Amino acid sequence: MWKLWGSWPEGDRVRIALIGHGPIAAHVAAHLPVGVQLTGALCRPGRDDAARAALGVSVAQALEGLPQRPDLLVDCAGHSGLRAHGLTALGAGVEVLTVSVGALADAVFCAELEDAARAGGTRLCLASGAIGALDALAAAAMGTGLQVTYTGRKPPQGWRGSRAEKVLDLKALTGPVTHFTGTARAAAQAYPKNANVAAAVALAGAGLDATRAELIADPGAAANIHEIAAEGAFGRFRFQIEGLPLPGNPRSSALTALSLLAALRQRGAAIRPSF
């Protein structure tokens, strides 16, 4: 069957390195599209053995320590990983693919990333992560009057280790409670491990400061639920996804890992979507 997504031409191969060695990185490494070769990984000091065991490749703490220069650096480690290696890679002309979209809520860091990419003649690519419909938002943003609200709903345990613990007793909840309302920029900055989706929605559509975000702890939620409500001159739409975790890893989004694999596959396609 003919597929829009295509694949890498036979004989062509792109070399990638990963930032991180957690569940998302391990899933990506285990399911690479044809034509994509994993040649190394970057990890924090002291994590070399764990990274080698998880990924089975050469490991370093800095890009220049890898035995082969990658064509693409894939960030699977979160904001800290992008901050540690993004600027260096982009400045050296290595393209970066990241799921840490919330890191761009820091306007200074975002500008530094853009400057580094321009200086290196490359680009920073943002994976869609745990959400969809970003293509529709991007199209709607070309019109007028766009208004967007993102709602993130998770079971209480999904908010552990976040700012929500400071305002809620997560173990005592008997019904849904909204613990954050504000801009997508503020959400991404206050919840760096939980609000990458809010930032992705905002950057695709109305922008970080014009997109409204609501974060909810809901003991009745069986999955992480992401919802986009948008309206403007184009019309209106509502999109919802109930995201499941990677098998055996309840805190890692399956769709986030799959979005990286999809981005890798699309890079090699002669015919592919424009989004």
Curated annotation (Swiss-Prot):
Record-linked InterPro entries: Asp/hSer_DH_NAD-bd (IPR005106), Asp_DH (IPR002811), Asp_DH_prok (IPR020626), L-Asp_DH (IPR011182), NAD(P)-bd_dom_sf (IPR036291)
Pfam families, sorted: Asp_DH_C (PF01958), NAD_binding_3 (PF03447)
Gene3D superfamilies found in the cross-reference section: Dihydrodipicolinate Reductase, domain 2 (3.30.360.10), NAD(P)-binding Rossmann-like Domain (3.40.50.720)
Enzyme class: oxidoreductase
EC numbers: 1.4.1.21
Keyword Oxidoreductase assigned: yes
One Gene Ontology term of the molecular function aspect: NAD binding
Catalytically driven reaction(s): L-aspartate + NADP(+) + H2O = oxaloacetate + NH4(+) + NADPH + H(+); L-aspartate + NAD(+) + H2O = oxaloacetate + NH4(+) + NADH + H(+)
Disulphide bridges, residue numbers: none
Catalytic residues in the record: H226
Role of this protein: Specifically catalyzes the NAD or NADP-dependent dehydrogenation of L-aspartate to iminoaspartate.
Other remarks in the entry: The iminoaspartate product is unstable in aqueous solution and can decompose to oxaloacetate and ammonia.
Protein name: L-aspartate dehydrogenase
Natural source organism: Ruegeria pomeroyi (strain ATCC 700808 / DSM 15171 / DSS-3)
Taxonomic lineage of the native organism: Bacteria, Pseudomonadati, Pseudomonadota, Alphaproteobacteria, Rhodobacterales
Gene name linked to the record: nadX
